[in-house]
Amino acid sequence: MAPAMGNELQHRTVLLEEAVQALVTRADGVYVDGTFGRGGHSRLVLEKLAESGRLIAFDKDPLAIATAQQIADPRFGIVHESFASLRTAIAERGVGRVSGVLLDLGISSPQIDDPERGFSFRADGPLDMRMDPTRGESAADWLARATVQELTEVIRDYGEERFAFQIAKALVARRAESDRLGPLVSTGELAQIVANVVKTREKGKDPATRTFQAIRIHINQELAELQVVLEAALSLLEQGGRLVVISFHSLEDRIVKRFMQAHASTPAVDRRLPIRAVDLPSPPLKIIGRVFASDAEVAANPRARSAVMRVAERIAP
């Protein structure tokens, strides 16, 4: 999501102008901001909308919800749920089709920069990692029960970490020492355990980066929820409506890319079958393009370096 430096009031939204320009195609439309964060995209969308326009935003984070509730605009509504609940939430609000869906994936800078949230290895804090700290299982709770196989699969698949098995074994070995050392509950200790195992260092990257990413994705079911919301967005978009997705790592971007490509392609048919091309169903999406943060934005906000924005438009009725 939108990176920042410093405290939560200094929140820089990545690809702000580019995303909103791609999203808003009609001023009287109904739009969805699936990841409100601190409201950078939402506020600019509202500036672009006519009085008859409408914006519905989602976020899991109670602090994001508190920020959203300060927006006194009758065109705006906030939903304290994951964007995976998009289909249900839209129906509950009496909306049929929407004109655009924006997803700014990952964690926000206020979440990263607050040690109490447990997302970062740069400062010691509780091992939480939940987007919504009031719901679900924390990272510490999961680490206290996960098997070597479960740990290996999560760290390997969601962190693309080559030392996943060794890290998993080290974590389970540390758990065996809980009676003497107490449970593993701090980000600092987790980062140290990983650093002791990962001997090959990537230039400019902390050895704990991949493991922290993997555990966070698992705890919040980020990739599974992304699949759900992409399907929901496709079904809810009106003809001409836009799907705009900003990703910050390859796992997310791969899912988004493949989804858009799959729904922008005519189904493959065996040429031996008596079916004409004109008889095949038209694909529902058209890919508009891919956008990266500019050099100027990256210079001002280094966390924008990894951002990739993909845009597709629904062309089917």
UniProtKB/Swiss-Prot annotation:
EC number(s) recorded for this UniProt protein: 2.1.1.199
Highest taxon of the lineage: Bacteria
Annotated PANTHER family: 12S RRNA N4-METHYLCYTIDINE METHYLTRANSFERASE (PTHR11265:SF0), S-ADENOSYL-METHYLTRANSFERASE MRAW (PTHR11265)
Xref: InterPro entries: RsmH (IPR002903), SAM-dep_MeTrfase_MraW_recog (IPR023397), SAM-dependent_MTases_sf (IPR029063)
Protein name: Ribosomal RNA small subunit methyltransferase H
Function: Specifically methylates the N4 position of cytidine in position 1402 (C1402) of 16S rRNA.
Subcellular location field: Cytoplasm
This protein's UniProt keywords: Cytoplasm, Methyltransferase, rRNA processing, S-adenosyl-L-methionine, Transferase
Biological source species: Paraburkholderia phytofirmans (strain DSM 17436 / LMG 22146 / PsJN) (Burkholderia phytofirmans)
Binding site for S-adenosyl-L-methionine: G39, G40, H41, D59, F83, D104, Q111
Gene3D superfamilies tied to this protein: Putative methyltransferase TM0872, insert domain, Vaccinia Virus protein VP39
